């Protein structure tokens, strides 16, 4: 939430270069961490630096290009989003398996340094800056509210819903978020303006993106677990299975950006969400005999749907805002996607765990087996039942996203309103 204030108050170069420096320092600390506490602090520092990058990139696109030009450039934005999942899991899996976890930081550090040098040379300042006063109370409420919610939700998969720390941090987080919203409504220059929700199409778009992220991030977290735990493959294998899908999404993001300029968001998002619904349904019937080639193919087709459904909606949503609300819209989009992704991961992992624990085997399915063999089969079936339940949740969420696309306005109607 702080990114809107930072982007509006400071220049593009100041924000980007500072973000890269902070991320670089966090990366160095992570690589040389002597214990888990230091590693956790390093990851927080990294997040402080990288958290501003996506809203800054989106705001820059909105500031530079007119609404009718943004489709292809938002597609390039999607390319960046797609390439990270394409490279990250595969590279990290290889480094962890064949070197050690510190290598993750050693590889990223020089890339960060090169990025800083390139930014120093090429990045120019864009947009109009607003010298708004710093409201300390808003900053505190924002950190306590969104930080508490994210911590609580992300802890569900390890500690469960009934854990007092989880419940208290989520409840307190919600209370502080409500207080944060109340505070913003009373400030002349808010830290994060909630006026963006006065536009119904922006609200619908944000809802679609949030619901889609719940399904997308949740599935992307759980699918590698299925590959490793059920199919008995290595972390490198799980990364390679997801690699084609991430590459396809990166390419399709550019294509969908150009298609948006011709067809608008409504048609593309409907087709995209339908593809995602159908392909996610396949995950509900996977078992220990599932072919990794088939799984990789289905996942790649699913990512075509994600690219068609997500990027045009993102462009359509941001096009609804006036220039002075661009930074607030970008920050709101990024914040809600982060929260939704955490909810998706926590939701799927929790359902998976609970369903596995409550699996009731049918004795007739294991007749003639030795006790050791029978216990092994029951354990595998319990895991598969858990994964099926988790992915069924993802299917239901995706159907909700599909239904929401019907609330988007047609391109023809939007053109008539603009004239």
Q: At which residue positions do the language-model features occur?
A:
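Select subsegments of transmembrane alpha-helices in polytopic membrane proteins
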Residues: 135-143, 269-271
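Residue-level hotspots within pore-lining transmembrane alpha-helices
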Residues: 29, 33, 45, 49, ...
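Membrane-interface helix caps and helix-loop-helix hairpins in membrane proteins
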Residues: 36, 127-132, 156-162, 288-289
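Intrinsic disorder in cytosolic terminal tails and internal cytosolic loops
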Residues: 368-380, 408-419
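Helix-loop-helix hairpins in multi-pass membrane proteins, especially solute transporters
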Residues: 1-137
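12-transmembrane solute porter fold
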Residues: 8, 13-16, 20, 107, ...
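Structural signature of transmembrane alpha-helices in multi-pass secondary transporters
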Residues: 23, 46-47, 75-85, 89, ...
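Helix-loop junctions on the cytosolic side of multi-pass membrane transporters
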Residues: 117-136, 182-191, 406-416
């Amino acid at each position: 939430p702080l990114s809107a204030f930072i982007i509006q108050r400071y220049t593009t170069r100041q924000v980007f270069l500072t973000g890269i420096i902070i991320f670089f320092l966090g990366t160095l600390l992570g690589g040389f961490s002597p214990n888990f506490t230091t590693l956790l602090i390093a990851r927080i520092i990294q997040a402080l630096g990288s958290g501003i990058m996506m809203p800054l990139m989106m705001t820059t696109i909105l500031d530079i290009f007119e609404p009718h030009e943004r489709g292809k450039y938002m597609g390039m934005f999607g390319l960046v989003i797609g390439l990270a999942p394409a490279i990250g899991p595969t590279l990290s899996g290889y480094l962890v398996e064949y070197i050690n976890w510190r290598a993750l930081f050693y590889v990223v550090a020089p890339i960060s340094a090169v990025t800083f040098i390139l930014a120093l040379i090429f990045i120019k300042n864009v947009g109009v800056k607003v010298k708004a006063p710093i409201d300390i109370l808003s900053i505190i409420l924002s950190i306590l509210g969104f930080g508490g919610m994210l911590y609580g939700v992300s802890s569900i998969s390890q500690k469960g819903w009934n854990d007092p720390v989880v419940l208290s941090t989520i409840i307190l987080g919600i209370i502080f978020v409500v207080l944060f919203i109340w505070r913003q409504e009373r400030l002349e220059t808010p830290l994060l303006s909630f006026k963006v929700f006065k536009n119904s199409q922006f609200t619908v778009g944000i809802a679609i993106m949030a619901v889609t992220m719940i399904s997308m991030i949740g599935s992307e977290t759980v699918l590698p677990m299925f590959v490793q735990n059920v199919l008995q493959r290595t972390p490198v294998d799980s990364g390679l299975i997801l690699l084609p899908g991430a590459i396809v999404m990166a390419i399709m993001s550019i294509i969908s950006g150009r298609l948006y300029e011709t067809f608008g968001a409504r048609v593309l998002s409907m087709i995209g969400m339908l593809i995602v619904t159908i392909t996610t349904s396949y995950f509900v019937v996977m078992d220990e005999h599932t072919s990794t080639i088939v799984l990789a193919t289905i996942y790649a087709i699913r990512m075509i749907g994600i690219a068609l459904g997500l990027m045009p909606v993102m462009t359509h949503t941001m096009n609804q805002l006036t220039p002075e609300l661009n930074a607030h819209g970008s920050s709101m989009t990024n914040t809600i996607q982060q929260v939704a992704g955490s909810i998706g991961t926590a939701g799927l992992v929790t359902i998976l765990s609970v369903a596995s624990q409550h699996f009731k085997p049918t004795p007739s399915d294991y007749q003639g087996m030795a006790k050791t063999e029978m216990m092994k089969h029951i354990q595998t079936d319990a895991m598969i039942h858990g994964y099926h339940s988790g992915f069924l949740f993802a299917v239901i969420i995706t159907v909700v996203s599909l239904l929401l696309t019907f609330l988007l306005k047609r391109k023809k109607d939007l053109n008539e309103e603009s004239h």
